[in-house]
């Protein structure tokens, strides 16, 4: 190992006996920061300790925190694809037709309302899109989503979803964590904490990022008070995909030599620290990053997909954002095939300010729908054709809906009182509609659901009892659903 020996000679070394085995060990008298600075290691290169653990006779003390765990219940789904439609899709323009809006378009609203964000509240505003009953189930879907109509019988449309807040950051964070205040783990982190992942080469919680940053920031995919292993890992749908992951060394041999040095540092630090979850988590993350160096290029190599498959997902579409979201959906399917537990897709920021159309509703919503309609329908069909839909739970939702009356002349304000979302796949009763808003589409009046209910049912379908998934924090056993959440049998096949 001439390269490794050369690196070792850069640092003063001393001998001492291991307090566990009594054997003489070599100790590098240098800080980890010094090693990293001197050897120019990136995060990915740091990760090869696992390579040498396999060569060692000594048993590893570092259990994989992402290893699969037994569910509480019989699972209906193994993976989740969470499609976050940032900004607020209008329920009365997508999945909740309201004939009275058309009949009374332009008239003063005949019902009381709560305060809106901008208080520029106009008259009733009819949808510019027509609805059509689709599939054998007859679920009404508007002209916004012509491709999604073809999979209507796979969807369970919930028309009675509610939100905690009318503000983007609070509502977005509540959707992701069950709470409107920062510091809580994301639902993806909870799922990975509860079940681990079936993938050895990828994190359990992956975000395929379209570019639109979350309102409220990265805490929406964070691990909160859970160990950092469970936070979401961001991937991009185009190069460089995973920044700073690829090996920077001129050869694999140089990287291997560096890892032999760092392995001694890791083991010495771990032995000195004793049982330390922070250190063990860091080492486990390094090991995962090393494995990803080999696995990630294959994941993102879409040349392995057939031309018809790429066309169905919209990778040849005229609209750039359709191509981008289509790539995200295709990567999501490939992550499911590789055993990743929780996958979130975010949207592209170039779609007329997300789904947040306070003005020019018709053009803004049309562009947003054009970006996602074809890819989402293709993903559902592709998963079904491959026998994966029954084990993959798909959730598509915004943080809240929009008002059935105008903001200004041609927009809609935020509405947390009642809105639509849908689920499909693993354990979901397809071809159904659950809940209802009032005759104008403003407020949920039948079978109202909260984010706690949504999370409880997501966990249930994955085989997790939401009342038993807890983590000790602040002197109490905390759970994703707090003291709330109910299982809705009507949603479940």
Name what the model sees in each region.
Residues 2-493:
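Ligand-binding pockets and gating/stacking loops
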